[in-house]
Regions:
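Short amphipathic alpha-helical interaction segments
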Residues: 83-98
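Short, amphipathic alpha-helical interaction segments positioned at domain boundaries
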Residues: 117-133
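Minor-groove-contacting beta-hairpin "wing" of winged helix-turn-helix DNA-binding domains
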Residues: 72, 108-114
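A short alpha-helical element within helix-turn-helix/winged-helix DNA-binding domains
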Residues: 70-80
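Short, well-structured alpha-helical interface segments that form or flank functional binding sites
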Residues: 47-51, 73, 88-91
Length: 133
């Protein structure tokens, strides 16, 4: 029974730490994180929803490498980093929250949902990898 339990019930911290390197390798061609946590997208052709999710995911992953970088990202950081107006950013963020790809941790603060990261980074590579490379 313990084998089944370990197979099915995961510790969220262990789950995401185990795959951090793999996920970072998959998104590193598309985004970089500054030492202060700032977001630098390396691809312009990405749609706004994917850009926002990539920024939130990258920030989350960066925190796993360097705890001085916050895992959450604010609405203002998203707007500034991605050059998006507030109404566009909030609309796309709402879609991502409804789709359970990200979660709001408090007003104007968002974080990636660990068990959604693999699906997202695979989608980004499939959708933008060849166009970008």
């Amino acid at each position: 029974m313990e084998d089944i339990r370990k197979l099915f019930i995961v510790d969220e911290k262990e789950f995401d730490t185990k795959n951090t390197e793999k996920f970072i390798r998959k998104v590193a061609d598309f985004v970089k994180i500054g030492k202060d946590g700032s977001i630098f997208l390396e691809i312009e052709s990405m749609n706004k929803t994917d850009k926002i999710q990539l920024a939130i995911t990258a920030r989350f992953l960066a925190n796993k490498l360097d705890k001085s970088i916050l895992q959450e990202i604010s609405l203002s950081e998203i707007m500034q980093s991605l050059s998006l107006p507030q109404n566009t950013a909030t609309a796309r963020i709402s879609e991502l929250i409804k789709g359970r790809s990200i979660k709001r941790i408090k007003a104007g603060q968002y974080v990636a949902v660990p068990h959604q990261i693999e699906k997202f980074v695979d989608k980004v590579n499939k959708k933008y990898g060849e166009k970008h490379g």
